Design a protein with these regions (language model features):
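Phosphate-binding loop and its immediate beta->loop->alpha context
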Residues: 27-155
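Gly/Thr-rich phosphate-binding beta-strand-loop-beta motif of the actin/hexokinase/Hsp70
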Residues: 2-33
């Protein structure tokens, strides 16, 4: 009797401008690669828009495509990973937003994107990062992913 349990492995490229997720489904002795982008299979923009009065959050492609519309009512944050270099924080709708919290919203967007396409909750992933990303920035990414319910297994 062979083991036919379906197993998944996920990888995330957490980029400054865009993010992408890939999944590998393993069943029996074969793998199937599944790319998770937006509806057109494009990478997800690393942007977050936070409503200045209500605190509602828009992320990814929606935030990117609605940036003009959202610019008046939202604090628009792009290139999320570049915030890791700065002592950055913003008080928006009564909540103190840090780079870690903003990055967590991007991870949630990626996780939701996978779930909408497969009904699978991405709970673990390997995350691709630039070679020079120091330990403090990796810690921000690890904490942000954990806030989104994703355990980073390793960085590559």
């Amino acid at each position: 009797m062979s083991d036919t349990k379906l197993k998944y492995c996920f990888g995330i490229d957490f980029g400054t401008t865009n993010c992408a997720t890939v999944g590998y489904a393993y069943i029996g002795n074969s793998y199937e690669k599944i790319l998770y982008g937006d509806d057109e299979q494009r990478p997800i923009p690393s942007v977050v828009a936070i409503n200045k009065s209500g605190g509602s959050v828009h992320t990814g492609r929606e935030a990117w495509e609605r940036r003009q519309e959202l610019s008046q009512e939202c604090e628009y944050i792009s290139s999320v990973k570049s915030l890791f270099d700065k002592e950055w924080s913003r008080l928006i709708a009564g909540k103190l937003w840090t780079p870690e919290l903003v990055a967590a919203e991007v991870f949630k967007c990626l996780q939701q994107n996978v779930y909408e396409r497969t009904s699978i909750i991405m709970e673990e992933a390997v995350v691709a990062i630039p070679v020079g990303l120091n330990a403090a920035k990796r810690r921000i990414l690890r904490n942000a992913a954990a806030s989104a319910g994703i355990k980073i297994l390793s960085f590559v």
